[in-house]
Amino acid sequence: MEELRGYLELDRSWQRDFLYTLILQEYIYSLAHDHGFNRTIFFENAGYEKKYSFLIVKRLITRMYQQNHLILSANDSNQNEFLGQKKNLYSQMISEGFAFIVEIPFSLQLLFSLEGKEIVKSRNLRSIHSIFPFLEDKFSHLNYVLDILIPHPVHLEILVQTIRYWTKDASSLHLLRFCLYEYRNWNSRISRKQYISFFSNRNQRLFLFLYNSHVCEYESIFIFLRNQPSHLRSTFSGAFLERIYFYEKIEHLVKVFTKNFQVILWFFKDTFMHYVRYQGKSFLASKGTSLLMIKWKYYLVNFWQCSFSVWSQPRRIYINXLXNHXLDFMXFLSSVRLNPSVVRIQMLEKSFIIDNAINTFDTRVPNIPMIGSFAKAKFCNIFGHPISKPVWAYLSDSDIIDRFGRICRSLSHYYSGSSRKKSLYRIKYILRLSCARTLARKHKSTVRTFLKRLGSEFLEEFFMEEEKVLSLILPRDSYTSQRLYRGRIWYLDIFCIHDLANHE
């Protein structure tokens, strides 16, 4: 921690929330370029020199202002395109450096607050599959759920105003505004939805930081409402928001709105309210009645519109009963169903049979969407019949089998917690037969002839099921391994949803 403090040299700048001194340090841009999107310097020792370069950023900004493509000749389209791309490159370089810089104060605050605790590096070990054990534990006892689509900001200035709550550095805010409007001006002909997609692809780090800050502003109200009825501070609010640098904003909300919301809070008093979110979709579940959920729905819509200047339509929030509706969440279809069980009780000479039903959280693979994804990736047709993949036919046999096997193992790994695996077996069958047809196409043979010559066992090694993997770790005769074979397994080392488009 001391090395980190000395390395970043924040002292007065950190106390005053000034970031512009970091913008003028050359090693920041080297770190942003070398470490990429998924890496961070906060747990690594970077060997860059601590030197200032006032010229590098000034030169880039000057070139961006000088490259005025509006005064160029309209006939020289190639030159316009080149200069425009070059100007866009300068903007991207500065925005990447800014995205790296703006994360530093909030990440430092996170590390300093967790100093001396055992969960210092826990944020690097989080898994999206840790959500499903939470849902199994909580949602099976609840009645209604709000299916919420978090609205996007209608104007870029809303994102800048969100950052203003945390930093007082006007220079950094102007630079952020400059980067955002530069992207929008260069792509003025595209729609707002296309602009968000374009911006997220060009600078994922800055986009995710702005989007997370935008979403967490919405989520701050949930902590406020949960703390008010119970008059107790939530001990898990840090994990609830996955950020702790929103405490100042939350405390401000409590001070400002406590007197005004006493009547409203009486309607929302519910000790069985649970909230979970992944990306732009969230769920708010309760054990209360449908009337309570209706009040929550319209309260959230009005609160977002009045406090965050975001137009949110009520039709983006759905009220569903968990008993008869499936939730489409993180590529799973989840629902709560009754699991009947019969218990026989023997008392002296008389016996009784008691029928009991227990609510269980059921997760299954969405069959139709998966078939559609496979058809889009050219593994099968729209009816689910496997076909060959011609674009992989030029690869070697081992590379073809390795690609198909990697996809199959990843999907099997991700959907291992599904309670109904029939759809998963069908997906494995599609991949297995598509692999065989691709190999047969390469060797100009039929699938039957190809399998007859090499044997169907040559694919087994690459399509090893999770149960076989467990058998290598746990002894066969152990009761634990037998129970794991029959039950569901959530692998907590998964950090992203497998995307078939990456294998195109």
Curated annotation (Swiss-Prot):
Example of a GO MF term: RNA binding
Subcellular location as annotated: Plastid, Chloroplast
Main localisation: plastid
One annotated Gene Ontology cellular component of this protein: chloroplast
GO BP annotations listed: mRNA processing; RNA splicing; tRNA processing
Keywords: Chloroplast, mRNA processing, Plastid, RNA-binding, tRNA processing
Keyword hit for Plastid: yes
Keyword Calcium: no
Pfam family, one: MatK_N
Protein function: Usually encoded in the trnK tRNA gene intron. Probably assists in splicing its own and other chloroplast group II introns.
Protein family per UniProt: Belongs to the intron maturase 2 family. MatK subfamily.
Stated name of the protein: Maturase K
Organism of this sequence: Nepenthes distillatoria
Name of the gene this protein is made from: matK
